[in-house]
From Swiss-Prot:
<comment type="function">
    <text>Regulates transcriptional attenuation of the pyrimidine nucleotide (pyr) operon by binding in a uridine-dependent manner to specific sites on pyr mRNA. This disrupts an antiterminator hairpin in the RNA and favors formation of a downstream transcription terminator, leading to a reduced expression of downstream genes.</text>
</comment>
<keyword id="KW-0806">Transcription termination</keyword>
<dbReference type="GO" id="GO:0003723">
    <property type="term" value="F:RNA binding"/>
</dbReference>
<comment type="function">
    <text>Also displays a weak uracil phosphoribosyltransferase activity which is not physiologically significant.</text>
</comment>
<comment type="subunit">
    <text>Homodimer and homohexamer; in equilibrium.</text>
</comment>
<protein>
    <recommendedName>
        <fullName>Bifunctional protein PyrR</fullName>
        <ecNumber>2.4.2.9</ecNumber>
    </recommendedName>
</protein>
<keyword id="KW-0328">Glycosyltransferase</keyword>
<keyword id="KW-0804">Transcription</keyword>
<dbReference type="InterPro" id="IPR029057">
    <property type="entry name" value="PRTase-like"/>
</dbReference>
<dbReference type="GO" id="GO:0004845">
    <property type="term" value="F:uracil phosphoribosyltransferase activity"/>
</dbReference>
<dbReference type="InterPro" id="IPR000836">
    <property type="entry name" value="PRibTrfase_dom"/>
</dbReference>
<dbReference type="GO" id="GO:0006353">
    <property type="term" value="P:DNA-templated transcription termination"/>
</dbReference>
<dbReference type="InterPro" id="IPR050137">
    <property type="entry name" value="PyrR_bifunctional"/>
</dbReference>
<comment type="similarity">
    <text>Belongs to the purine/pyrimidine phosphoribosyltransferase family. PyrR subfamily.</text>
</comment>
<dbReference type="Pfam" id="PF00156">
    <property type="entry name" value="Pribosyltran"/>
</dbReference>
<dbReference type="InterPro" id="IPR023050">
    <property type="entry name" value="PyrR"/>
</dbReference>
<keyword id="KW-0694">RNA-binding</keyword>
Amino acid sequence: MKKKTEILDAASIQRALTRMSHEILEKNKGGENLVLIGIKTRGVPLAKRIQQKIKQIESIEVPLGELDITMYRDDLDKVSEQEDPKINSVSIGMDITDKHVILIDDVLFTGRTVRAAMDAVMDVGRPSTIQLGSLVDRGHRELPIRADYVGKNIPTSDREIVVVQLSEQDQEDRVSLYEK
């Protein structure tokens, strides 16, 4: 893999998350009845950052959950035989019935991860709405899924890969574009 360019630096990521937080509050008329759910792995720290920004803006703490969608994926047959997929129960840690659930992920690509996340959420409860926030939307949908809140739209080719690095896991914040 060869690095082509850095798309977002740490300051750009923070600005994008601040804007997304304001958009979430504006669309939902405040933070009441909201639940943020980070899709593992990098959606979780992004959701935590949005939660903190909403707290700074509105002085309320929006409930935060984590979602592992491994068993909801429709591409498990493509996992190599040496890799056993982990079987994890869905536990968001709160009642989401009649709440506005905001799913947070790092990169929106084909839409398959989001579809799996929506299936998992619906197995746990019946939210009023499910909305989607993504730090990067790179296009190439295979399913009719669109993000409500996007940090940056980055049109890519099939031969490019978007890599999100976050300080919580990677020691630095950066979004880069690589060529396969």
